[in-house]
Amino acid sequence: MLAPFAYFFPRIALFYAVCGAYDVGRNSGLNLSTLRRYFIGNGFPTWVLSPFNILLDLLSLPYVNKGVYHLGDLPPAYQDEVKRLIQAARDANFVGQLEEAAKKHPRTMVFFRWYGVNKDTFFNVPAFHQPWKYIQTIGVSVFNKKVSTSLHFGFMRATLRILYNLNDMKDDSAYIVVGNTTSYWRENKLFIFDDTLLHQSFNETDQTRYCLFVDMIRPSLFPGVMRALISSVRILTQSFKFIYYQNWKVIER
């Protein structure tokens, strides 16, 4: 499919080749397997969106994309929202509310906010529905025992992915890998990263893992532009959200 496209549209093909080379080159530990996965595997949609994502990188300057972040790398107002959200999540009894539903499926997800719009679910957490300035998506993911994801890329860089493990893990068999970075949930409950980088989450423990799942608008001198783009994405993806989370059981009611 790619060869005929390059033959009939050589300039567009060259443009996409350059954008894709830059985009995939951001992954540390780059190898042939990563290239194959990006260009002809599950990273293909990320390649298709690479010009758009590069534009988002430019709009985010002077805040350079670090790939993997510490909380202190974010502006103070962003840090404050993250801390408030984490405290609200700690105060909610997610384990008790989700334990029974999660037993039926390897991976479960419940959303309280989706790209800037609050969602009604079977579990009411009023603190999640406060007017957030930067937080766009709030969910809780549940990994059953001995359940991991495959290696995959996210699609869009208008947001940063923020994960916070809600329950205490007993050993280092639960962790996330992004490029050359491995973070163990037993040691560090908070992990912030650009999810368009190749990543994989592991739960090889005998525990169910409950994780706060958040998308936060990237720091930018043009936050209004970022919000408008995110709103557009919400409208475009609302009716086929299942494609994003086809390997998850999304609980709504």
Where are these regions (language model features)?
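A short hydrophobic beta-strand segment most commonly corresponding to one strand
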Residues: 161-166, 192, 207-223
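A short glycine-rich, His/Asp/Glu-containing loop-to-beta-strand
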Residues: 127-145, 158
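A short beta-strand-loop-beta hairpin characteristic of the jelly-roll/cupin
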Residues: 167-187
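Short beta-strand His + acidic residue motifs that chelate non-heme Fe in jelly-roll/DSBH
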Residues: 149-151, 174-175, 193, 199-204
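Transmembrane helix interruption/hinge and helix-loop junction motifs
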Residues: 2-15
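Short, conserved beta-strand element in jelly-roll/cupin
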Residues: 142-144, 155-171
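Conserved metal-binding segment of the jelly-roll/cupin
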Residues: 184-198
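Non-heme Fe(II)/2-oxoglutarate
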Residues: 12-128
